[in-house]
Amino acid sequence: SMRGRGGLRTTVTTREQTIVDCLSHPDRCGGIEEALMSISLFPYVDAEALKELVSDKSASLAARTGWLLERKANKWRITPDVLDEFEKMAKGGPFKLDKDSTESRGWSRRWRLCLPEKEEEVEKWLL
């Protein structure tokens, strides 16, 4: 959306849209590690708004988003039923956490997601 202040107009985004943008195009955010570090600092997210943004996108985005939500479930108060809904949207696979990565050193079974490093290492990127 556009917001004006003192005659200046600036484009702003929601936390949820930022998550979708970062997980869709990590190359525009300094890479997947930087993207995950940045978005994991959000104090909270609106899971319903995020679900709505992801619902008309790819199953791979649903898998990446579901994986992130599962890891941040306690901090962001994400309920198991929300994770189940993302899992239903993430049909098919396997998918890649970083679609540009040539490496696949880790695997998330629930999300059928290839990780660029072992899962324990990737989880360290989440702050």
PLM features: residue spans?
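Hydrophobic alpha-helical interaction segments
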Residues: 1-127
